[in-house]
Amino acid sequence: MRCLTMPMLLRALAQAQAARAGHASVRGLHSSAVAATYKYVNLREPSMDMKSVTDRAAQTLLWTELIRGLGMTLSYLFREPATINYPFEKGPLSPRFRGEHALRRYPSGEERCIACKLCEAVCPAQAITIEAEPRADGSRRTTRYDIDMTKCIYCGFCQEACPVDAIVEGPNFEFSTETHEELLYNKEKLLNNGDKWEAEIAANIQADYLYR
């Protein structure tokens, strides 16, 4: 009688397992081939007409864009907010900001405006009206300087045309009113604005001096 050693037993077990695996794969292929010939009851094939294809594409796109939008929202949820709590907080203004108009004076208190009327001529909205008379010393000064702020388009041409930096557009942008008449500025109103913002206006002009 032949005695079986351990290596022989292991080899026999490996051959038996390989044979079983081969039979299983053959059965799987056979089952797949048979299943392909089955007729499934109530199986609805997707319609391939243009309307159905378009509807399916639209639904897919809708959900895709919806998920992308939600993802974008969540990505900004924990970031630093870009908005500020206006009017309690205010953002920085450029030195070139064009806001409410003002007429400036020299440090001596003398009006800068020499009544050349260049600002009146250059204004594309025809919002500026100037009247002037000569003084006893021969210099010309304005007797009337009106700006209709409802016409002004804040182009800054008046400020650029002025040879003595008399008319400027100041840093104030909060000058809403309840009546139309309050937006018709006269010379006194403009000079008061200039006196109020002179330090800031002078600093802005100096900051922008190299680019003028």
From Swiss-Prot:
EC identifiers of the protein: 7.1.1.2
GO molecular function, one term: NADH dehydrogenase (ubiquinone) activity
Residues that coordinate or bind [4Fe-4S] cluster 1: 113, 116, 119, 162
Cofactor: [4Fe-4S] cluster
UniProt-listed GO biological process terms: mitochondrial electron transport, NADH to ubiquinone; mitochondrial respiratory chain complex I assembly
Recorded topology in the membrane: Peripheral membrane protein
Keyword presence, 4Fe-4S: yes
Residue span(s) of domain 4Fe-4S ferredoxin-type: 104-133, 143-172
Coiled coil: none
InterPro entries (UniProt xref): 4Fe4S_Fe-S-bd, 4Fe4S_Fe_S_CS, NADH_quinone_OxRdtase_chainI
Catalyzed reaction equations: a ubiquinone + NADH + 5 H(+)(in) = a ubiquinol + NAD(+) + 4 H(+)(out)
UniProt-annotated binding residues for [4Fe-4S] cluster 2: 123, 152, 155, 158
Keywords: 4Fe-4S, Electron transport, Iron, Iron-sulfur, Membrane, Metal-binding, Mitochondrion, Mitochondrion inner membrane, NAD, Oxidoreductase, Repeat, Respiratory chain, Transit peptide, Translocase, Transport, Ubiquinone
Family according to the record: Belongs to the complex I 23 kDa subunit family.
Subunit (UniProt): Core subunit of respiratory chain NADH dehydrogenase (Complex I) which is composed of 45 different subunits. This is a component of the iron-sulfur (IP) fragment of the enzyme. Interacts with RAB5IF.
Function description: Core subunit of the mitochondrial membrane respiratory chain NADH dehydrogenase (Complex I) which catalyzes electron transfer from NADH through the respiratory chain, using ubiquinone as an electron acceptor. Essential for the catalytic activity and assembly of complex I.
Name under which the protein is recorded: NADH dehydrogenase [ubiquinone] iron-sulfur protein 8, mitochondrial
Underlying gene: NDUFS8
